Amino acid sequence: MYFLLNLVGLIVIMAVVFLCSPQKKKIKWRPIITLIVLELLITWFMLGTKVGSWAIGKIGDFFTWLIACASDGIAFAFPSVMANETVDFFFSALLPIIFIVTFFDILTYFGILPWLIDKIGWVISKASRLPKLESFFSIQMMFLGNTEALAVIRQQLTVLSNNRLLTFGLMSMSSISGSIIGSYLSMVPATYVFTAIPLNCLNALIIANLLNPVHVPEDEDIIYTPPKEEKKDFFSTISNSMLVGMNMVIVILAMVIGYVALTSAVNGILGVFVHGLTIQTIFAYLFSPFAFLLGLPVHDAMYVAQLMGMKLATNEFVAMLDLKNNLKSLPPHTVAVATTFLTSFANFSTVGMIYGTYNSILDGEKSTVIGRNVWKLLVSGIAVSLLSAAIVGLFVW
């Protein structure tokens, strides 16, 4: 029964996004169907085969090694803290970001990461027959994050139509950054994090093409290659990366503290008017129909709906910390669906980040395309997360 409900949920999510599209007649269904089939194959391979499980295990081992290397550096600075059996969130999840950012920048410095993005993007473009730039951007998001991926293609953004600019804004809602993965792994199961990442990239293409279908003539389907800037020396690069990583840690820490405190304050105010009413309860009821359609029993659906609302209103870290404390009491399907949904940057603050990035890259008139379509960005981010969760849910019971 719950499997059929999960399958119906997949169809309902697509149908709701289709109804939200203002240009239904322009939608090209062949690329969308191709990508859905590709996603089902990827999910089956990663979750349903021994080779896929082995591959996820090896990727997980690699990130565990990265975190262990980062922990050595943290232990040098904070030996007494790292000697404890239980280490606080700041030390276990946030400080490793400094080293992981540096590591990914080293891969970029030597051309390894750009090569991977180029090859995978080419495969996606050929398989889906979608524009090259959009296909490459979906892969860039998987490694770099939304603002960084937008910065990489900033020269091309300046000459794109408003319609295509909106497409990149919609896709940016579902990004993730390779440097943050280690933090996720300290809170939720690696298997579902690594499965969610490629699904989010492909679903970002699907949802963007449903909400904002764009026709790109063949002569315009090109990727602008800017002239190579003078390369900084290696040690200047990694030193700058470490500072960038520390800045990310401070920003995330500030947001987590601020949002948790704000949630507590809002709950206190709500409790004055209605005894026991919390923002988590409100979100649980708002998102429960969608959570129920992911094949969850009523009790679990209410809890996952609460996590969905927390992620949208605050960020994925706050929601993952809550999920971490309840993992042992939840069945595998619920854990898989919840983890997959939470693995992305889709929330209100991300809209502000995307708008700010567009403002810094484009002139005032073009950058307003984001401000005029905030609701589409939110629909895109939520729909991509729901779609990824629904697909993973089909394979985990």
Swiss-Prot record:
InterPro entries per UniProt: C_nuclsd_transpt (IPR008276), C_nuclsd_transpt_met_bac (IPR018270), CNT_C_dom (IPR011657), CNT_N_dom (IPR002668)
Pfam families: Nucleos_tra2_C, Nucleos_tra2_N
Compartments it resides in: Cell membrane
GO annotation, biological process: nucleoside transmembrane transport
TM regions (residue ranges): 1-21, 32-52, 62-82, 97-117, 133-153, 165-185, 187-207, 242-262, 282-302, 335-355, 377-397
Membrane topology: Multi-pass membrane protein
Molecular function (Gene Ontology), one example: symporter activity
Inducing or repressing factors: Expression is regulated by the XptR regulon. Negatively regulated by hypoxanthine and guanine.
Entry keywords, A to Z: Cell membrane, Membrane, Transmembrane, Transmembrane helix, Transport
GO CC term (a single one): plasma membrane
Membrane listed as a keyword: yes
Superkingdom: Bacteria
Disulfide linkage: none
Major location (coarse): membrane
UniProt similarity note: Belongs to the concentrative nucleoside transporter (CNT) (TC 2.A.41) family.
Role according to the record: Involved in the uptake of the purine ribonucleosides inosine and guanosine.
This protein's name: Purine nucleoside transport protein NupG
